[in-house]
């Protein structure tokens, strides 16, 4: 292997890690019938003239396995927080008690569980596509480089190995999430 061409595999790995991090965020937004503070992460509240994450206007807690509470710091925002949760598409019916909003998490029926596993599969496929796009970028860099056939084969093997590792991580996370969703 000559010293002429060095592929930045750290950059490729960092970008593939980004796809995994994005997948985790998408998976966290899927309601599994189990209470989790992370399920409210995508909810944005119209507070003080700007769209603000819910955790910046109140404290999110999970006091029970099927209950999430939001203790809103500013009494004037309670209705806006309640509206944001109601309109978030999470299928949760908020109950207000002063500045505390209680979110009872209903059990999921079998049909909804199956729908959510399909959604999780779609998220995982999007992550696989993102990983493969990074792989293609790496392969394109190798093809554009003026390097020997042996060097090109070495780098292509390294990129493929990295890709396989990340695709397996996506598949493992999907399997775990689907088991979590289907668990009654």
UniProtKB/Swiss-Prot annotation:
Pfam families: RRF (PF01765). Coiled coil: none annotated. GO terms for cellular component: cytosol. The gene is frr. InterPro entries: Ribosome_recyc_fac (IPR002661), Ribosome_recyc_fac_dom (IPR023584), RRF_sf (IPR036191). This is Ribosome-recycling factor. Disulfide bonds: none annotated. HAMAP family: RRF (MF_00040). Belongs to the RRF family. CDD domains: RRF (cd00520). It comes from Jannaschia sp. (strain CCS1). Responsible for the release of ribosomes from messenger RNA at the termination of protein biosynthesis. May increase the efficiency of translation by recycling ribosomes from one round of translation to another.
């Amino acid at each position: 292997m000559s010293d002429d061409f060095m592929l930045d595999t750290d950059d490729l790995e960092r970008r593939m890690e980004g796809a995994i991090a994005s997948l985790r965020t998408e998976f966290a937004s899927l309601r599994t019938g189990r209470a989790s503070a992370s399920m409210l992460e995508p909810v944005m509240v119209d507070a003080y003239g700007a769209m603000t994450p819910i955790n910046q206007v109140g404290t999110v807690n999970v006091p029970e396995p099927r209950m999430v509470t939001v203790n809103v710091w500013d009494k004037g925002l309670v209705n806006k927080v309640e509206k944001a949760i109601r309109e978030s598409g999470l299928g949760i019916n908020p109950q207000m008690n002063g500045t505390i909003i209680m979110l009872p998490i209903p059990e999921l029926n079998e049909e909804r569980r199956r729908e959510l596993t399909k959604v999780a599969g779609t998220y995982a496929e999007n992550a696989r596509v993102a990983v493969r796009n990074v792989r293609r970028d790496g392969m394109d860099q190798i093809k554009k480089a003026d390097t020997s056939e042996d060097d090109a084969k070495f780098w292509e093997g390294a990129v493929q190995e990295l890709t396989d590792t990340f695709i397996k991580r996506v598949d493992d996370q999907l399997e775990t999430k689907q088991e979590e969703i289907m668990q009654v």
